[in-house]
From Swiss-Prot:
This is Leucine-rich repeat-containing protein 15. PROSITE patterns: LRR (PS51450). It is found in: Cell membrane. The chain crosses the membrane at residues 537-557.
Amino acid sequence: MPLKHYLLLLVSCQAWAAGLAYYGCPSECTCSRASQVECTGAQIVAMPSPLPWNAMSLQILNTHITELPEDKFLNISALIALKMEKNELANIMPGAFRNLGSLRHLSLANNKLKNLPVRLFQDVNNLETLLLSNNQLVQIQPAQFSQFSNLKELQLYGNNLEYIPEGVFDHLVGLTKLNLGNNGFTHLSPRVFQHLGNLQVLRLYENRLSDIPMGTFDALGNLQELALQENQIGTLSPGLFHNNRNLQRLYLSNNHISHLPPGIFMQLPHLNKLTLFGNSLKELSPGVFGPMPNLRELWLYNNHITSLPDNAFSHLNQLQVLILSHNQLSYISPGAFNGLTNLRELSLHTNALQDLDGNVFRSLANLRNVSLQNNRLRQLPGSIFANVNGLMTIQLQNNNLENLPLGIFDHLGNLCELRLYDNPWRCDSNILPLHDWLILNRARLGTDTLPVCSSPASVRGQSLVIINVNFPGPSVQGPETPEVSSYPDTSSYPDSTSISSTTEITRSTDDDYTDLNTIEPIDDRNTWGMTDAQSGLAIAAIVIGIIALACSLAACICCCCCKKRSQAVLMQMKAPNEC
C-alpha cells in the first residue's frame, strides 16, 4: 500500500477517535479538547447527561440542581477533578460517587447540604482535596472520613457544626491543611487532633471557643499556622504551644485575653507573625515575648495597655513591625524598645501619651516610620530622633504641641513625610526657627492640611508655613528681649531669615524716640537709587529666595525617592489579612 494511503488511514482513525472522545457532550455544557467539561447557568436543573467518557475535569457551577442521584458518573471513571459549587444542592445519594476511583479533588462548597450519608465517600478513597465549606452541615461523623488516608486538605469552614466528635479525624494521617473556621462549636476535645502529626495549617477562627484544653495541640509538631482569632478565649494555658516549635503564624486577635502567662511563647523559635489585637490586655510583662528570634510582626493594637516597661520586647531582635495603636498608653519607659534594632514600623497613635523620654527611640537605628498622632503630646525632647537617622515618615498630627525644639529634624535626610496639622501652634517669636525650617522643607508636609496657628488671637487660623514673619513677641511682662536661651544653637536653621526676622521683632523701643535732628544726613545711594543698607537687604532677600527654592526642590526629589522605597514597608501597617 502506498505511503499516502497509510497517512489517509491514520488521519481517518484520529478523526474517528476524536469524534468518539467528545461524543455525548451535553448541549448545556462545553467540552474542550483537554478533557475538560463545564456546565454552568441557572437553566440547568438536573445533572447533565451523557457526559464524555474521557472527561478528566468536570465543573458544575451556578445551577439550580438540588439533588445528586446515584450512578451519574459511572461512564467517566477517568475523572480526576469534580467541582460542584454554588448550586442549590441539598441532597446527595449514597452511591453518587460510585466508580470514581481516580478522583483526586472534590469540591461541594457553597451549596445547601445539611447532612452527608455516612458512606458517601467510600468509593473515592484516593481523594487528596475535599472542600465542604459554606454549606449548612450540622454534624460530621468519624465513618465519613475513615478511608481518606491520602487526604491532604479538608475544608469545613462556614457550616453549622456545633461540636467536633472525638476520633473524627483519626484516619486522616496525611492531612496537612484543616479549616474548621466560622462554625458554632464551643469546645474542643484535647484528643481531637492527636493523629494529625503531618498537619501544617489549622484554622479554628470565628467559633465560640472560650477555652483551649491543655494538650490540644501537643501532637501537632509540624504545625506552621494556627488561627484562633475571633473566638471568646479568655485565658491561655502556659504550655499550650510548647510542642509547636515549627509554628510560624499565630493568630489570637479579637478574643477576650486579658493576661499572657509567663513563658507562653517561649518554645516558638520560628514564629514570624503574632496577632493579639482586639483583646483585653492591660500590661505586658518583661520577657513575655521571647525568645522569638524570627518574629517579624507583632500586632497589639486595640487593647487596654497603659504602660510599657523596660525590655518589654528585648528578645525580638528581628522584629520589623510593632503595632501598639488604640491602647491607653500614658507612659513608655526609656528602655521599652531595647533590642529592637531591626524595627522599621512603630505605631503608637491613638493613645494617651503626654510626654516621651528623649531616649525612648535610641535603640531603633533602623526605624523608618513612626506614628504618634492622636495623642496628648505637649512637647518633644530635642534628642528624641537623634539615633534614628533613616526616618522617612513622622506623624505628629492631632496632639497638643505648641512648638518644637530647634533642629529636631535637621539630621533626618531621608525624611519625606511629616504631619504636623491639628496642633495648637503658638505663633509668637519663639516659633520662628520652626517656621523657617518648614518654609525650606514644605514639600515634606505633603499636600494635605498644613499646620495652623492657634494663638495669639491676631494670627489664629493662619498657616504656620505661609504666615507673615512679623510675629508678635512672646507673652511676657516688661520690655521684650531676644529669646536666645530658648534654643541652644541657631546654626541649624537658616541664619539669614531667622536673624533678620528676630532683629525686627526684638528691636529696642528706644529707637522710636531717637532725635532725628542729631543725625547727619548721608547720601550713600548707589547707581540703582538705593542706599547700601537697602541694597544689602535686597541681595540678602534674593539669596534667601534662591536657597529656599533649591532646598524645596531637593526635598521634593527626596520625598519621591523615599516614598518609592518605603511603599512596600508601609503596606505592612495595614491590618493583617489573617486567613
